[in-house]
Amino acid sequence: MFLAQEIIRKKRDGHALSDDEIRFFINGIRDNTISEGQIAALAMTIFFHDMTMPERVSLTMAMRDSGTVLDWKSLHLNGPIVDKHSTGGVGDVTSLMLGPMVAACGGYIPMISGRGLGHTGGTLDKLESIPGFDIFPDDNRFREIIKDVGVAIIGQTSSLAPADKRFYATRDITATVDSIPLITASILAKKLAEGLDALVMDVKVGSGAFMPTYELSEALAEAIVGVANGARVRTTALLTDMNQVLASSAGNAVEVREAVQFLTGEYRNPRLFDVTMALCVEMLISGKLAKDDAEARAKLQAVLDNGKAAEVFGRMVAAQKGPTDFVENYAKYLPTAMLTKAVYADTEGFVSEMDTRALGMAVVAMGGGRRQASDTIDYSVGFTDMARLGDQVDGQRPLAVIHAKDENSWQEAAKAVKAAIKLADKAPESTPTVYRRISE
């Protein structure tokens, strides 16, 4: 039997906590026997004193075990259970292509996703722009879809890592969100509850990233890889660029449209293609579906070329109560904005810099994201045809096409786009899409 205040005191004084102490505290968070004040105190001591790797693994596992951990053995699946998690960005629609692509190559992807957070778009919000799409199928239906289709993308249920929800809510109001051990445990508790064989992390770097500097993004990626492998889930991480909008679009319906176009081959943004392929390659290799980069890329390109990945996406949409002919007729089903009009720069020049975070917030301001949990989303608004770093813009080439609900909203968005995109006399040097791969 432990006392919560003694565990807090031990950590306050700079000592490492045992696995039993951490489990006692996390179970108390779940059972409401630990007060909010005690959660806040422990969070602050961890913020200042950090945690050792064994402590980080124990915290993550205790949070994972605070609820249901999915077990797939009874389904006798003939492939690995794999997933991807992104720290979030703008125009980051990779999940919608990656899940079907990896499933078409023999993997099983039980993806539990989130809503938009701050300036970043949420996969669930994007999918809900598809009429009828059910992000909360019951457990049996979720398992059926995974077995039959190979991929399902759903929302987090209250049974998965419930201690994390309460812990995070307290961190959010006590300035302890940005602690690497706590971020790591929060991300991985939910992902490891999926019962994975392998995981790839997409950790963003740049003006639209969750972490403010390259060094902090790198530290988070290294922490996640270390903890997940310590929890015996094969995990790698890629540091990918978020100094500009990743896709050509940013919003909800507009990104779903681009995802379908990507899968069918109608249009593939080169940077989005690079990042999506790189993440899929990691999943195939970690899941032992390919022996090396070359074999993985060949398999992935094949399922894009032969239409199998697009077919899997269509089957997933239908299985989750969306239209059965969505891939063929996406334009008919996705909502469109009242006003669609291009915004142009005031002067000619080359796009030299982009405040990606500000562009994400501009989508939120138009109604494409939430300022508070109770807000309803306008799925139709957003940006398409986004200019990229190095593009020459003038009276012919716009900075973006804005999809807005009315003229006022369009004017505000146009102002935000012009302020967020800097021009120069010459094009900047190109930056990589993937900066670094981190493995155990």
Curated annotation (Swiss-Prot):
What biological processes does GO assign it? Answer: pyrimidine nucleobase metabolic process; thymidine metabolic process
User: Which regions form coiled coils?
Assistant: none
Q: Which keywords describe this protein according to UniProt? A: Glycosyltransferase, Transferase
SUPFAM superfamilies assigned to the protein according to its UniProt record, in alphabetical order = Nucleoside phosphorylase/phosphoribosyltransferase catalytic domain, Nucleoside phosphorylase/phosphoribosyltransferase N-terminal domain, Pyrimidine nucleoside phosphorylase C-terminal domain
Pathway where it operates: Pyrimidine metabolism; dTMP biosynthesis via salvage pathway; dTMP from thymine: step 1/2
Identify the Pfam families for this entry.
Answer: Glycos_trans_3N, Glycos_transf_3, PYNP_C
What do the Gene Ontology cellular component annotations say?
A: cytosol
The EC number of this protein is 2.4.2.4
Q: Does the keyword Transcription apply?
A: no
Q: Which domain of life is it from?
A: Bacteria
Q: Does the keyword Transferase apply?
A: yes
| InterPro entries reported for this sequence | Glycosyl_Trfase_fam3, Glycosyl_Trfase_fam3_N_dom, Glycosyl_Trfase_fam3_N_dom_sf, Nuc_phospho_transferase, PYNP-like_C_sf, PYNP_C, Pyrmidine_PPas_bac/euk, Pyrmidine_PPase_CS
Free-text function comment from the UniProt entry? The enzymes which catalyze the reversible phosphorolysis of pyrimidine nucleosides are involved in the degradation of these compounds and in their utilization as carbon and energy sources, or in the rescue of pyrimidine bases for nucleotide synthesis.
Q: Which family does it belong to?
A: Belongs to the thymidine/pyrimidine-nucleoside phosphorylase family.
What is its quaternary makeup?
Answer: Homodimer.
Task: Provide the protein name.
Answer: Thymidine phosphorylase
Q: Which gene encodes it?
A: deoA
